[in-house]
Every structure is written in C-alpha cells, then in structure tokens.
A protein has these predicted regions:
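C-terminal regulatory/oligomerization modules of transcriptional regulators
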Residues: 1-4, 11, 23-37, 42, ...
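Short, hydrophobic-biased segments on the C-terminal half of alpha helices
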Residues: 49-50
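Short, Lys/Arg-rich nucleic-acid/phosphate-binding segment
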Residues: 62-68
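Pre-recognition alpha-helix immediately N-terminal to the DNA-recognition helix
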Residues: 18-20
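Helix N-cap at the start of a conserved alpha-helix in ABC-type nucleotide-binding domains
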Residues: 14-15
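Short basic coil micro-motifs at the edges of alpha-helical modules that engage polyanionic partners
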Residues: 9-10, 68
C-alpha cells in the first residue's frame, strides 16, 4: 500500500503549524519547549510536529533523550515553486501592460 503524501498547502493551513514554523526560524527547539508556546497538550503539539516532519518542513534530531526540531528547506520547495509560477505570471502581465501604455503614450504625443 502506498504511503499518502501530504500537500504542503494543507500542512501550512493550520495556524498552529505555521506558528511552529515561525518559532523554528529563531532556533532549534525540543518538543517540550515548543509545547510551552501553545495552549494545547503536548501530544497535540507532537501530532503537529509529526505532520510537519512527514511533509518535510522540519527535521528531528535526537540528542540524548531529547528530540530537537529544526527547519528543513526542502519542505518549502513546493510552496516556493507555486508562488514563483504566479510571480512570473504577474511579472509578464505587468510588463505587457507597461509596453501597451508606453505605446499609447507615444501615440498621444504624436497627435
């Protein structure tokens, strides 16, 4: 049976997971330290961390008895590619608009 993959947008749709990602931009945290930032149980935070890990947004490193979470750049590739697609789309549209407006401005000056 194939392992289901997680859609990056579904993963970051949850505000708690986005907050975890933002916290991890500052430093690596162990799971207990992350849980202290939320008004939910440690198992609930662990579930969010598991989802982020499965989706590739974070790595988990075991140091002694502690598990530390760190951001993983690879998890953001799908998001970046999607955003870049629309960035290119809008850049192209705005460039075409600029060319059209410049042509109209030149034509109006000739009159």
């Amino acid at each position: 049976m194939a392992t289901p993959t997680l859609d990056a947008f579904q993963v970051i749709a949850d505000p708690s997971r986005r907050q975890i990602l933002q916290l991890l931009t500052k430093d690596s945290y162990n799971i207990n330290s992350l849980a202290e930032n939320f008004e939910m149980s440690r198992p609930a935070v662990s579930k969010h961390i598991s989802i982020l890990h499965t989706a590739g947004f974070i790595t988990i490193n075991e140091i002694g008895r502690e598990r530390y979470c760190t951001l993983n750049k690879n998890g953001f590739i799908e998001l970046r590619n999607w955003i870049n697609h629309f960035d290119e789309f809008w850049t192209s549209k705005l460039k075409k608009l600029e060319i059209t407006l410049n042509k109209k401005t030149k034509n109006n000056k000739r009159i």
